[in-house]
C-alpha cells in the first residue's frame, strides 16, 4: 500500500506525515473548463479511515517515532472513526478542521466531537497551510477564541477545573502544533 510505504519513508527521514483525504476535485466541469483547477468546485466526500488505514496502522500504528496527522472533510468521521483511532494508536494525531470546516462553527463541532474520545493531546491544536498568507493571524485568532470558548464551557459545566483550562489553552494555541511538527 502506498500510504504504508510513505509512512516507512517518513519514519526513516524523521518527517511528519499528513493525510488530507475526502475531496472530489473539480466537480463542476464547466468551472474547470472556464477557470481551471482550484477554483472552488471541489466537494467533500465520505472517507473510510478504519479500513483504509488498517495496513499502515498494523505496521506503524504503535511506532512512537512517527507522527501521522489526519485531516478530514468528512465531519461524520470525527467521533465514529478519527477520535477512536487517535485515542488508540500513538502514531496518529488529529489535524484541525480544514477547508470547508475552517470556520468558527466547524472548529467548535470538531472539538465537541473528538475531545471525549481522543482528548486534547491527540490533536495538534491549530496549524495553517493556507495560501492566503495575510489571513493567517485572523485564522489563528479565531481558532484560539473557539478553543477558549470550548474550555470555558467545560469549566462552566464543572467537567474540568479552571486551572486545567488555563494549562490547556496555551497547549491548544501553540505547544501541540510545535510538538506534532517537531519544531
Regions found by a protein language model. Give the residues of each.
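Short, contiguous acidic/charged loop-to-helix segments that flank catalytic cores in large enzymes
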Residues: 39-45, 98-103, 138
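Mid-to-C-terminal alpha-helical segments outside catalytic/metal-binding sites
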Residues: 120-121, 138-183
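Divalent metal-binding pocket/active-site signature
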Residues: 1-77
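Short acidic (Asp/Glu) and glycine-rich catalytic loops that position anionic groups and cofactors
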Residues: 30-36, 89-93, 123-130, 151, ...
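Short acidic/histidine-rich active-site segments
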Residues: 18-22, 69-73, 94-98, 120-139
Amino acid at each position: 500500500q502506498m500510504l504504508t510505504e510513505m509512512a516507512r519513508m517518513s519514519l526513516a527521514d524523521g518527517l511528519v506525515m499528513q493525510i488530507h483525504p475526502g475531496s472530489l476535485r473539480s466537480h463542476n466541469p464547466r468551472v474547470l473548463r472556464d477557470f481551471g483547477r482550484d477554483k472552488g468546485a471541489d466537494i467533500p466526500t465520505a472517507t473510510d479511515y478504519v479500513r483504509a488505514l488498517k495496513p499502515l496502522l498494523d505496521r506503524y500504528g504503535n511506532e512512537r517515532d512517527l507522527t501521522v496527522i489526519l485531516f478530514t472533510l468528512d465531519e461524520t468521521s470525527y467521533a465514529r472513526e478519527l477520535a477512536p483511532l487517535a485515542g488508540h494508536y500513538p502514531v496518529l494525531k488529529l489535524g484541525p478542521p480544514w477547508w470547508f470546516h475552517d470556520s468558527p462553527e466547524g472548529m467548535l463541532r470538531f472539538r465537541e466531537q473528538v475531545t471525549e474520545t481522543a482528548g486534547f493531546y491527540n490533536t495538534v491544536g491549530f496549524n495553517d497551510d493556507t495560501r492566503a498568507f495575510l489571513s493567517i493571524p485572523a485564522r489563528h485568532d479565531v481558532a484560539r477564541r473557539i478553543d477558549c470558548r470550548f474550555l470555558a464551557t467545560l469549566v462552566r459545566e464543572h467537567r474540568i477545573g479552571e486551572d486545567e483550562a488555563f494549562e490547556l489553552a496555551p497547549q491548544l494555541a501553540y505547544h501541540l502544533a510545535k510538538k506534532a511538527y517537531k519544531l
